[in-house]
């Protein structure tokens, strides 16, 4: 599979006083005491952009917190939003759009860390890649329709998801194309559904993150990159770490984000081991170790912690989330982010 030409990128917990911590955390899923016996519930998804969770879990970084961590795996963002609304989640590592939905619904939470930036690629069938002319995108898709008798179909995550919004931005803002006129967009049920749809040639292309592109290459499927997010949306957001206010206003916030940053540093220095951790948590049947390792070499695997690095892209996503009816208003950076936790780290 053709790869885009881009350079590959780049214990301490201060416990709060018992009474103050209990007061500040009233209403939190697991009220965090100072004796380490209580529970912090962390939602995550089995996707590469949640790599920090895999490392924190497998390297024992959660043990540095004065609270036990209960990880809950979800297949999609909307399910995490529902769990957040029910008060079942303290911290969630998932997409920026569902994080915005949580905030827009008035649930007391903010993004305290980013997990990754620019992790998306636009892939198309090899036949279309030969036709693709970025200077005449409408003509390229019309040629496909003329030769195949059908409109080009992108299959990606459901409407309003990070992959979906990135695809719409690429089509509309970058190439002045209209979904439903020049191309069709089909919402699939997640990464595995997208992969199967491509393998069965139900879709002609996709907007997707690792490890799907690497799995496509490993299985010799006829798809390749025609663009990557870094080339048209620098600082593109994806998975983030959303924290409930009851946790965010306690010392636990800094402790958690400190371990998140530590995990990001570990990933940078130990990419193969981090890949093995991802395979262990996700499951080797779904993510074989060799595929996980190869995906780490992808230009889409850009792991970060500083939330400011995705601020510009988040503004674009906020506009699209509102336009698609996922939020009632266009959220500002101030409404979405709390930079103080990261900025306060030693």
PLM features: residue spans?
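Short, polar/charged alpha-helical segment
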Residues: 46-73, 78-79, 100-105, 165-174, ...
